[in-house]
UniProtKB/Swiss-Prot annotation:
Species annotation: Nitratiruptor sp. (strain SB155-2)
Record GO biological process: tRNA N1-guanine methylation
Pfam families hit by this protein: tRNA_m1G_MT
PANTHER family, alphabetized: TRNA (GUANINE-N(1)-)-METHYLTRANSFERASE
Name of this protein: tRNA (guanine-N(1)-)-methyltransferase
Binding site for S-adenosyl-L-methionine: G110, I130, G131, D132, F133, I134, L135
Amino acid sequence: MKITYLTLFPNLMRCYFEDSILKRALEKKLFEIEFIDYRAFSHNKHKKVDRYKIGGGAGMLLEPRPIADALEFIKKKESWVVFTTPVAKRFTQKDAKRLAHKKHIVFVNGRYEGFDERLIEIYADEVFSIGDFILTGGELASLVMSDAIVRNIPGVLGNSASLEEESFEGDLLEAPSFTKPDVFKGKAVIKEFLKGNHSKISALKYQLARLRTKYYRPDKRIEDEK
């Protein structure tokens, strides 16, 4: 298995594999790792990869073009692309066991306020959260999932029997976000976001948040609108 990490902080992630079980598994070539810096694909002379949100809202979003270019560069037929975000289904041990059979997993790690939603729509094979809490970036989440996945690769654990014995804010998830360009890979930003009517944008975001929560987190109870 090969695991590729798309990130703004490759050096931050490398150190996790310098010790313990994962280091030994790498040395035995039971899996391999690769780190890709978004900035290497930036079209900005200052290597910036963040943009303001369309329609307003706090914080910046990762610009879609560098991430798309990075994915186009490294993706192969057998690649399985996973986006890390708190607004997704919960990663479980069942997922870890299933993904341990993949030949190539690509973790796309968020920063700032996350991704332009169109990236997920175009490229994601799966979208995972590791819990109802917010981190400063997706790197820790992808490392958590990687650890859980790699442990299920035959030969990684000294005792295979170990595997057999192992056992937000508010009620809604965040609505989709978008940044420039207005049209990306044939997908346009929702028109209401471009009109600047913040009351309508707020109402639309609320409805989108309800739909997203029902879709990704059916375990969350959502009260019916009155």
